[in-house]
UniProtKB/Swiss-Prot annotation:
Record-listed E.C. numbers: 4.2.1.49
Cofactor note: Binds 1 NAD(+) per subunit.
Function text: Catalyzes the conversion of urocanate to 4-imidazolone-5-propionate.
One function term, GO molecular function aspect: urocanate hydratase activity
GO cellular component: cytoplasm
Cofactor: NAD(+)
GO terms classed as biological process: L-histidine catabolic process to glutamate and formamide; L-histidine catabolic process to glutamate and formate
The protein's name in its UniProt record: Urocanate hydratase
Active site residues per record: 411
Taxonomic lineage of the native organism: Bacteria, Pseudomonadati, Pseudomonadota, Alphaproteobacteria, Maricaulales
Principal subcellular localisation of the protein: cytoplasm
Keyword Methyltransferase among UniProt keywords: no
Enzyme class: lyase
Amino acid sequence: MTQTRRDNSRIIRAKHGSELDATHWAAEAPLRMLMNNLDPDVAEKPEELVVYGGIGRAARDWESYDRIVATLKRLKEDETLLVQSGKPVGVFRTHKDAPRVLIANSNLVPNWANWDHFRELDKKGLMMYGQMTAGSWIYIGSQGIVQGTYETFVEAGRQHYDGDLTGKWILTGGLGGMGGAQPLAATMAGASMLAVECQPSRIEMRLKTGYLDKSATTLDEALEIINAACAKGEAVSVGLLGNAAEVFPELVKRGVKPDMVTDQTSAHDPANGYLPAGWTLAEWDEKRESDPAAVEAAAKASMAEQVKAMLAFWEQGIPTLDYGNNIRQMAFDEGVTNAFDFPGFVPAYIRPLFCRGIGPFRWAALSGDPEDIYKTDAKVKELIPDNPHLHRWLDMARERIHFQGLPARICWVGLGERHKLGLAFNEMVRTGELSAPVVIGRDHLDSGSVASPNRETEAMMDGSDAVADWPLLNALLNTASGATWVSLHHGGGVGMGYSLHSGQVVLADGTVEAAERVGRVLWNDPGTGVMRHADAGYEIAKDCAKEQGLDLPSV
């Protein structure tokens, strides 16, 4: 069977408007969102089906993509398409309230859950890496992580700088699909940012989409811009063309002191996502094909040097955090025994939100009309009137975030709020206030949908960091609740062997039946997050469960 991974002739964009290519909206929705993942304004390498995160793909190969598209176009209202690591493998009769698509990506039996075995299967065409929202068809560009990054920086500012990041600057690495959100999140939070990125195309994309203010080609130039802005109390973001493994140690050597340090390089995938120190991009590209083991070894050695620099900042009292790319683990494996001295961002800043089921709720307008998103923004403010922080976020998002592909919005809301918003959006579709249906989903990075001991479930108070039952239960419950498509993935964010996670997307098409599904899914999905944290002993989660009337027999 022919398998084509690269096709430069392909330019994919989702259909806009109310005319369907599928036979009904529940199949049209995943069709448009799959295509949206591969829009050139959205994906990192759309010609290779790569959406973000190293080699996070939307489909296994172009032949599989074409078969998925053809199948969705003919899928009946009582049928379910099964997708195995980016390849459509079956259509079965279920019922109208069942998911239209069920997706399993990158899942390996634990003893074989490592990059070496994955790469063997990947090379044979038997598997693909789905990341989190790449293979589950709900990536919305860098906006998808902007608010989570913003919330992290704001909370860090509260904890370390009395809530004021004016005149402060953050050092980071990586401006890919996820890391590209950092500069905008920083300036929204009031801080400047120096972001080190080795690929010029990524800097150019972040400048083009408004996520980055300026670029620099030398460290001196970048520091001059940062220092000038901080002196004036202004917030500016600078993308420095360079290698984080070289720039971080150089800053330590010079005695330069950022006010916060983190990293979002694709360290989770050392063979494909991290440029070794001293290497050119051309050498890196060639060696990834000819000698991936050498690339991985050199990349891990370079990560160790970067983490040593991060530890040096931490030891000087500078807030330093792992932003979930598993770089500490890579350094630890290279002999940096104190790599975990500085914390991950979830236990340091985000877990109290997870305890209340608050996480990255997102929706996209299938019409392609930005006005549909602006109307839903107003509806969120109307239904959640007493949250000025959320209102400020929505105002900033409208002003500063450029839509990529289909217009979309993200805002962090929790149990008791998500279902109200979803039902309101469905009603707006029914009355014609919105010009076409919307899809409502989230990142896999959420309170009840992931087991990842070096990220979302790091340092759980009961020691249950590695218990992977929770994302499985989340996926099963969302399937039973009637989500339009449900996904279960392995290895997203932190790489093979380090995470299991699930996702859901539900369609609001204005029908009574959709309202029932939306209400169930958007209550149950965040409810599993409160359940998971209450079960682990967090009092905030127990209180939330009691307030919301959750039935948790063991709590």
